[in-house]
Amino acid sequence: KSSAASDVYKRQNMEQSFQKGVVLHLASLIEYTEGGVISKQLIKSPAGNITLFSFDKGEGLSEHRAPFDALVQVLEGVVNITVNGTLFTVKAGESIVFPANAPHALTAVERFKMLLTMIKE
């Protein structure tokens, strides 16, 4: 949301190669950073991206749009997500799909981790 959070996000954004063909505990593959957001890409391909995120309490992403459908799976914590003007509180173990081009935003109610899957058409 804030420019400070954006700066932390940019510094913490990492592309990392993860071992394939082994069992992964997704939530343990990403840490939290105080006052910030971290992302780690698991898979990046022309067909789409799968990215892990962690958000400290109160951090978030301001309203934006993406040209593709996106699935958010909350791994830990609680997040408020707005999609097309409707507020949803999403908890660990729950998911939500953002339709392509739908305005959406999120704010961490408490620290949370999520897996974002975006399939390109």
List the predicted regions and their residue ranges.
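A cytosolic small-molecule/anion-sensing beta-strand core signal
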Residues: 75-76, 91-92, 110
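A short glycine-rich, His/Asp/Glu-containing loop-to-beta-strand
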Residues: 27-59, 120
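Glycine- and acidic-residue-biased ligand/ion/polar-headgroup-sensing regions
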Residues: 68-84
